[in-house]
Amino acid sequence: MGSDYITITITLASPSLNQKPPRARWANTDWETLDRIIKGFKVPDAPSCPTPPKLDEWMSEWLNPLVALLKEHTLVCRPSHHCKPWWTPHLTILCREYYKAARSARKNDTPHMRELGGTSKAGYFKAIKAAKNKHWCSFLLAATPQSLWRAKRFAYGRAQPRFPSLPGAETPQQMNTVLLNHFFYPKEPCSPPPRLRPHKSAPSLTTEEIDAALAQCSLTSAPGPDGIPYSTWKQVNKINASILLRILAPLVLLRYHPASLKGSNGVVLDKPGKPSYESPSSFRIIVLIRTFANILAWIIAVRLLAAARLSRLLHPNRCGSLPGLSTYNACLTLTNDVKTLQRPRLKVSPLFLDIKAGFDNVDNNTLARILSEGGIPNYLVSWGSSFLGERSCTLIFQGAPGTPAPVIVGAPQGSPISPLLFLLYVSPLHFRIPWGLMISYVDDFALTVASLSYGGTIRRLQKLFKKLERKASRLGISFSVAKTELIHWRTPSQRHSAKWVAHIHIKGEVFHPSNSVRWLGYWFTPALDPAAHFSRRIYLPRVHAPSFVASVLPEQASPPIYATDWRHH
């Protein structure tokens, strides 16, 4: 062999079918058999003053068998591309005749046999098209407001998820590390207490609190790593309410969140409309937590919200993730106060800000200090510290290694208590503004000031932004400069004024006043004309509805809807 030849190693392997793993069909759980078993399921008392590992062991000893019991009596389905919901017995007969005629035409290549094979083929595929249209039409006739979006997904198809392409990360393991370091900043972990002791002033957990928490849980929420939905826990609690009560009650009294409930899956999704996807900031992570952990989080969230309102830790202009305060309330408050400031013929200007990666920057020690200084009961502060500490997350994307990684900082966005913890974390940012106001909705802030001129409002906004930035730096958070927007409100008498074009300098960048700003889903114009918002909302259905209706008509090519292969676990 000459030097021009290089030995090539070839490995032969069976093709990968990329079959999806079986998943439980919780709508077909055998509750008749489980009813008797769950009624006799007994949970012993938790240790009185255990160490954290001892309580984790007790938690896993009784929760894991319960989860295994539920999965054992639940059917599993394996998605298959060979099972079609529109398939009929008549198509089976036509399929056999078609393949029989095709084989005969290949064996006896005569004009008569070729014509017979072509006729059989045309009839077979025509029957397939008719069966698809019939099934699609019946699916649309039975559509509900919720399943209509499912029909749209079938009609348009689902976009393939982007594979992260990050500089300096060539392997899935390197990409996993880069994404973890971007979203969950490395930090020294907090050490848990050596021994857990019951809090004397903590109210005992009641079945009413558990029922109220389960009522808040949505049946359409995606489950966490264990795959159990809220509907299953609701049925378990309905059969035997003592199970959830005896497992969750010690966790409240001992102010502890077990390690077995801190594991989560982080689904990496690309943000639509980004010019480039070579940066981790072009992606977002949706954290999926075990539903059992979220039940406890709902209970603590209700107690924490009541304590925060009692201690006046939440500012009156703080909206978002609070009952009864929606985006409509925030926008209505902003509009009403702007008109009030304009009555003395003052110029009014707002600056819209957005906190960068707000949930990912929540520091455990800082939050505990804010809650303690705000008068929150000690058992809620301790439970919050335990909830945020020593978590783990397994990133899910194409080619992900699937290894859990420790998460030291940040609040998981998939938990019902995380929005409230974030609101309390940024509560020190709110301060009183003379002749102005500050309104916030989760991580969106609006600074509005009034002055005799627009130049005066710009100077006031710059001073207030520096003050707000100093407060934010103490919390370890910052504002996204790219999402900053400025607008100057105008009254009808100021419509033809040429002095409202004053711009503002923020961190070395110049922001000119916009003719329209979209904040919290509402469109604002300098004249506060509501027609600017409603005209856009009315225009969108007129543009997108015809294409959507055309795509779901039965006469069109029906999208493939795959059924499942049912098997008992």
What is the predicted role of each segment?
Residues K200-P412:
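Conserved pre-catalytic core of RNA-dependent polymerases
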Residues K200, K463-K466, I477-N515:
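Short, conserved micro-motifs composed of acidic
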Residues M1-H81, Q173-T177, P530-F548:
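Surface polyanion/phosphate-binding segment centered on an Asp-His-Pro turn
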Residues C77-P79, K84-P89, K126-A127, H135-A142, ...:
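Non-catalytic, peripheral interaction segments enriched in hydrophobic/basic residues
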Residues I300-C319, R343, V348, P419-L452:
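Active-site palm subdomain of RNA-directed nucleic acid polymerases
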Residues A357-G374, F445-R470, L528:
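Catalytic palm subdomain of template-directed nucleic-acid polymerases
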Residues V43-P79, F183, T232, V236-N265:
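Amphipathic alpha-helical blocks
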Residues L12-L17, W26, M59-W62, H73-C77, ...:
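Basic/polar low-complexity segments
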